[in-house]
Amino acid sequence: MNYRASDFGRVAVLMGGWSAEREVSLVSGRAVLDGLRARGVDAVGIDFDREVVDRLRAGGCERVFNVVHGRGGEDGQLQGLLEIAGIPYTGSGVLGSALSMDKYRTKLVWQALGLPTPAFVLLESEADLARAEALGFPLMVKAALEGSSIGVYRVDDHAGLREAWQEAAACNSHVMAERCISGSEYTASILGEQALPLIRLETPREFYDYEAKYQANDTRYHIPCGLEPAEESALQALSLRAFAALGASGWGRVDLMRDEAGQPWLIEVNTVPGMTDHSLVPMAARAVGIDFPELVWQILTQTMERQHGE
């Protein structure tokens, strides 16, 4: 269905919040705000806090474009508030957001469904360190409830494992260790029911960390990704299945690896990905002729389709 900008009413672009990803979210939010206004949408920016529902109602906002990364905005809490308030919003619902935010439970779901994801161990005590070591070094140690590679460490020995566990636990999150995959890193951007062209990521760092994502100029993004069409299609299909398995919907991103034998491995899902000038979803959209204002327009129209059951 074709919509006019006036059909959406006033749209609140929620950004900021209180997570470790606040600054990135503010940059994403400003970009989304500019993109919506470029399409004539009556959009206002709101820095997300615990009084957000009252502020939305006071401002006459009829729907929300959510760009709050991390805890509070990406983990089901904001989604639950908006559901109770009856305010349509972009992206995944409560369940899909909560599951996808938790890297450990994400992998439990994929494992139960037979989807390929690297072997992993939850680190709750000293005894678990030995179980993690049995996976074989190198390992990735991750704070399970953080995004943007915050609280993520690559370790090569017992001392590094112990230190990384303690550092990640300081993020006030449960921590897991995961077998490190050697190979190429890809990301699949999800828009509606389709996976956009894959991007292959290349960084001189040990992995695609926070600096590589948002600050570095030496990260290389390959699109086309260099795979044969059938290989790329297979990874896109796997990404769509992994996304849906978590109850995620609307838009997002699936990160995966492909090892030296060509085996794919699912890593994680982002249900509110970055929308900065370094961000991957806008980059993938441009590859199929979707500019930034059109991208945010398409994401916003999903709120109408969900609201009216289209």
Task: Tell what function each PLM region has.
Residues 13, 190, 256-258:
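Conserved hydrophobic "DFG−1" position in protein kinase catalytic cores
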Residues 45-49, 175, 179, 249-261:
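A short glycine-rich, hydrophobically flanked beta-strand micro-motif that places a catalytic Asp/Glu
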Residues 77-83, 207-215, 271:
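Short, flexible, mixed-charge acidic loops at enzyme active sites
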Residues 109-114, 228-310:
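ATP-dependent carboxylate activation and anion-phosphoryl transfer catalytic cores
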Residues 156-237, 260-265:
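Phosphate-binding site of ATP-dependent enzymes
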